[in-house]
Each structure stands twice: as C-alpha cells, then as structure tokens.
UniProtKB/Swiss-Prot annotation:
Function comment: Catalyzes the formation of 6,7-dimethyl-8-ribityllumazine by condensation of 5-amino-6-(D-ribitylamino)uracil with 3,4-dihydroxy-2-butanone 4-phosphate. This is the penultimate step in the biosynthesis of riboflavin.
GO molecular function: 6,7-dimethyl-8-ribityllumazine synthase activity
InterPro entries, A to Z: LS, LS/RS, LS/RS_sf
Family listed: Belongs to the DMRL synthase family.
Catalytic activity: (2S)-2-hydroxy-3-oxobutyl phosphate + 5-amino-6-(D-ribitylamino)uracil = 6,7-dimethyl-8-(1-D-ribityl)lumazine + phosphate + 2 H2O + H(+)
Example GO biological process: riboflavin biosynthetic process
Protein name, UniProt field: 6,7-dimethyl-8-ribityllumazine synthase
Organism: Chlamydia pneumoniae (Chlamydophila pneumoniae)
Keyword Transferase attributed: yes
Gene3D superfamilies attached to this UniProt entry: Lumazine/riboflavin synthase
Source organism superkingdom: Bacteria
Residue ranges the record marks as coiled coil: none
Length: 154
C-alpha cells in the first residue's frame, strides 16, 4: 500500500503571499512571519513573491489575477487581519474572502492557504499575528509547503 504525504521542504518551490495592509502593524507581522517560514524551510528569495493589497476583500481578486497570468506557483498563502467592529461589515468581509479563496483553490486545483486572522478584538488578533502566541502565517506557510510537495507526487 502506498501513502502519499507532503513534507516541509520549500527547496525549488515557487510560492506567492498575497497580504492585506489594513490593520497594518498586525498585517506586516503576519506577512513577515510567513516570509521567514518559507526561507526557514529552504525556500529561496527568488522562489517567493509577496503582493500587498489594501484590504482583505481585495485578496481573492488579486489571487485570481495572479493565477491567470503567465507566472506559475506551487501554492499561495493569503494573509490578512480582520477585527470585528460594531456592524455586520466584518461578517460580510470574512465570509466573502473565505468563500472566494476556497473557490479559487478548487477552480485552479492549487493549494491556497487561508492565513486570515478573523478576531473579535485587537488583542486576539495580535495573538494570532505572532506577537504573542500562535502565528497563522507560519501555519499557513507550512501547510502551503506540505501541500505543494504533496501535489508534486499526485
């Protein structure tokens, strides 16, 4: 019986990060940790492209534009920080971004990981951005690397 499994080696991989700028300090920390993780697992600076967009809502459209271009990637990591406010706007954005990214992953049959921090407060958003605690960018990049290496075996 054969079992296929990805591994944590970014050597020779081409990965894109599409990160929002809104909630800038947290978003910058999220993107930075994502970039560092790619390099930590053997990826090269030439194998990594980072694209920054104004907000999380712009991430799915930017990913689609990227995937429709001549450039080829093994995986994409979507990074953004959304903090719940007093209106329903937060829920609308979170749902649209997640649905859009999921649809693109299926449409293009490409690993696109969701490193979108969706938090009820700035304190929790900081915890998920890597300043204190779990870093969603790190987990998103490690998942992207594992999935990209798995897809080369299928």
């Amino acid at each position: 019986m054969k079992t296929l499994k990805g591994h944590l080696s970014a050597k020779n991989l081409r990965i894109a990060i599409v990160g929002s700028c809104f909630n800038q300090a947290m978003a910058d920390a999220l993107v930075s940790g994502t970039q560092e993780t790619f390099l930590k697992f053997g990826g090269s600076e030439d194998g990594l492209m980072t694209i920054r967009v104004p907000g999380a809502f712009e991430i799915p459209c930017t990913i689609k534009k990227l995937l429709s271009s001549e450039r080829k990637f093994d995986a994409i990591v979507a990074c953004g920080v959304l903090i719940q406010g007093e209106t329903d706007h937060y829920n609308q954005i979170v749902n649209q971004v997640a649905a859009g990214i999921g649809a693109l992953s299926l449409e293009f049959c490409l690993p696109i990981t969701l490193s979108i921090v969706a938090a009820p407060s700035a304190e929790i958003a900081w915890q998920r951005s890597g300043i204190k605690g779990r870093h969603l960018g790190v987990s998103g990049m490690t998942t992207a690397i594992e999935m990209a290496t798995l897809f080369t075996q299928i």
